[in-house]
Amino acid sequence: MKFKYCLNESVKTTVQPKTKDELKKIIEDTIKEQGFNCDLNFIDTSLIKDMRDMFAESKFNGDISKWDVSKVENMRNMFAKSKFNGDISKWDVSKVENMSTMFAKSKFNGDISKWDVSNVEDMRYMFYKSNFNGDISKWDVLNIENMSHMFDESPLEGNEPDWYKD
């Protein structure tokens, strides 16, 4: 089967969606053709500002480690109820304002300790009922207006970072 976004059988071309809906369609097409563990790094996400619900309730667990998310402002519910547990440690999330329920009820437990979350205002229920147990003690959370229930029913409940205020 020839993959939709390939120049030939082994060389993927880069595609640059201009909208969230275009991005979602490319992801769905690729997963349908290659499975849930596919590599999505051929997608240039540098124009996308909203990734809300992008992988919510998905079985996707492939590679998106090289995605340029530097313009994204909304990651609400992005991986909620998903199986995703890939490497997103090098993502530039410095423009994100909303991370509420981003990993709620998800399998994610990757390293996000070096994320710049200084512009995030909403982290409520971010790790609610998730598997997350990472070290985020050095996050700059001065801008956060709402972090209620951020760690409820997660491994970090009772072991929250010092900066946490419910």
Task: Tell what function each PLM region has.
Residues K2-D166:
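Negatively charged
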